[in-house]
Structures are given as structure tokens and as C-alpha cells.
Curated annotation (Swiss-Prot):
It comes from Citrifermentans bemidjiense (strain ATCC BAA-1014 / DSM 16622 / JCM 12645 / Bem) (Geobacter bemidjiensis). [4Fe-4S] cluster 1 binds at C16, C52, C86. Residues 147-377 form the Radical SAM core domain. This is Ribosomal protein uS12 methylthiotransferase RimO. [4Fe-4S] cluster 2 binds at C161, C165, C168. GO terms for cellular component: cytosol. Its EC number is 2.8.4.4.
Amino acid sequence: MSEKTKEKVSLVSLGCPKNLVDAEVMLGYLSQDEYEVTTDETQADIIVVNTCSFIKEAKQESIDTILDLADRKHDARCKLLIVTGCLPQRYQQELAKELPEVDIFIGTGDYPRIAEIIAEKKQTEEQLCYTGDPNFVYNDEVPRLQSSPHYTAYLKIAEGCSNNCSYCVIPSLRGGHRSRPLATLLAEAKALVEGGVKELNLIAQDITAYGRDLEGKPSLELLIKELVKMEKLKWIRLLYAYPDGVTDSLIQLIKEEPKVCKYLDLPIQHISDPVLSNMKRRSGEAEIRTLISKLRREIPDIAIRTSLIVGFPGETTDDFKKLLQFVEQTRFDRLGVFCYSREDGTPAAEMPDQVSERIKRERHKKLMRTQARVSFKHNRTLVDSEEDVLVEGYSEETELLLKGRSSRQAPDVDGLVYITAGNANVGDIVRLKITDSSDYDLIGEIVD
């Protein structure tokens, strides 16, 4: 195929960073197969929507996006609309019936075949659906095409999950936990760093389970120790750490290794033991409190992020009050709150004492208001301190302000630092003095 006749493909990725990596892998396969990648959907011959169906809101966003692009398909040059990921893996038959506008559905196990499936579609008018076993694990030979800014990337160290929490559909959509080989991860990381990446964000459904299923059982700590040897890599961030997998050796590594961000994403989901038990979480209240105390004792400046679920079946008023009080007392640096989503096929969906949507929303609002106060007070304590900040570009509001993130702020989910004085290039890591703060963001000036 000549350069002039290359078909253009655009990919929209929804959901979590793990989905984004899947999207980048698919783009790599397509670019390797002589498709030209474009970010302009109006110029694309083929549009791919990589979907999420983890909770109700994610499913709705995926459906809305598909319908929007299906409408555009009639107005633009798009010839094929492809839906990939968790949504077709879970709802293949329903989607095929309800969305005739979609030409191809591809589940989470068939990403490597995307170019082959497109070629097959060009030989038939029929809608194609491929949703085999979700057991795909990519290696460093897969041509991942990075779509995030050049200075930051996600490194997906494992696929699937074997924790089997009672509310979660991930094992059925992604399969059981499968660690990627250490050599594969190091080769991919090396390529990313040589391409300009300064910040690697390690992700999986549970990063602390890394290596348990591999020969020799290489640990998360070993992976980190190998990554820090890469001279041009400046920050390593740990996301999605299951509480009972956070070992003393991991805590010491975060404490002592300068390249490991003093940051830990630690989803605990709740603090009430009856709720945690019904969720099938392995860590109870005592273990969670002990771990958080240990982290802060060993690493006083660590930023702890967590995720919580409100309105889980059987969550009483007292359970919620306990959670609210816990958030006030614990003072998490970052916090995400989700209303429980009743997902077909999960044990929690069949539990008695389902909580009404109204009460879920009320509890969500109360928890977020509490966290806003906690975050505001914490950010005020940072005024006049200094932070290393990764510059990400100009503020959306004005080009008079640069913006960035400190090592205590993860991409996409945490706040930002706005830079009011000093010059820097995108991708630079600069020293900043914090001069002001808001609920979630910081303001500062570059210091010499």
C-alpha cells in the first residue's frame, strides 16, 4: 500500500489508564499494518471506540460515545465503526442487536487480530463480532504507539485480576491475574524512556500481585529496583496497590529510593468491617488503619490516594457515619468516591438490602464535601514549601499560566500546580515554591 493510499484510523479510548494502554497497543498493530493514525475523527476512514463497562456510568459514557460517532459516520468519511474492549466482551449479543451501525465488535482477548478482522470485514457486509477468552497479554515486541504526552506513560505490569471482590466484573472481562515477564517490562520501559518519558506510572488491577504467577516469582520491588537504574527516568509512581500486598520492603523502597514518588494509590473501598466482609475484601479495619499509620510513620511526606464505595448493599447509616468519620480523621491526600453500581453476574447484585440511588448520591455528596475540606486544609500547609513539578503546558484558562504536577499528584485523577512566575519547557521538572492553594490545586513560582 503506497503512502498516498493509506487509510486513516482514529481511536477514542474511554475509562481507566489500563484501557488507554490497550488502545495504544491496538494503534501499534494498526500502524504496523500500514494504517495512518490520526487524532481527527472527521478525517478518519476507520474509527475505533475502546470502551469501559466497569460501572453503570462507564457503560453509559461508552454507549453515548458510540451513538455520537455513529451519527458522524453518516456525515463524515468514516467507512468502518469498530467497538472494542470491555463493553463488547460483556454484552456482545445485546450490542450486536441494538447497534447495527457498528461494523465490528472486538473483545478484550482479540486486540492482536484487529488488522486481520478489519481485512475480513472488507470482504463482507455482515457485522462481525469477536469476543473470545480474555487471556491476551502483550509483550515488548508489540508496537505500542504512545498517545500520552512524551514525558509521561503508563506501564501495565499485569493483566486481569484474581481478587474476586463481590461487586466487581473485572475477572469475567479480563480474566485472572497474569503478570507480564520482567524482561518484557524492562524492554518496554527502556523504549519509553529512550523516547523521552520521565515519569512511569505502574498500573494493573493489583500491582502488588505482580510476579506471584511467574517462574522465580519476581516481585514488584525487584521490578522497581531494575527500573531505577534507567538514568533518564526520573519518577516512578505506584497506582492500584491492594492493601494486604503492601509489604515492609515495598514501604522501605518508597522511603529510600529518590526516583520512587512519595505517593501510593491504595484503594480500600470502605472501613466498616461488615461492609468489607460483604465486599470480599481481604483487609479489614484494623489492617487498613495499621498500614496507613505505618506508611505515615515511615514516610511522613507520603501522599496517599484511596478509592471508596458508598451505598454498597447492606451499608447502614452507622456504617456510613463510620466511613465519614474515618475520612475526616485519616486526612487522605487524594480521594475518589464511587456510588455502588449493581452489576449483573456479581455476588453483590444478589445481596439483600440494596441501597436506594437517592441515598447513594447523598452519601457521595457528603463524603466529597468532607474531602474538599480535608484537602483544602492540607494544601494550606504546603504554602511556602518547595516541590519538584513536572511541567505539562499552559493552563486552559490562560496562556499566562503554566501548569504541571508535583511528584505527589498523579496524572488525570489528582489536582494540578499552576505556575505564575518563571519559564520552563513542557516536560521539564522544575523546583517550585508554593505560594497559594485551593481545595485541590496548588499555585507556585519557579525558584532558581
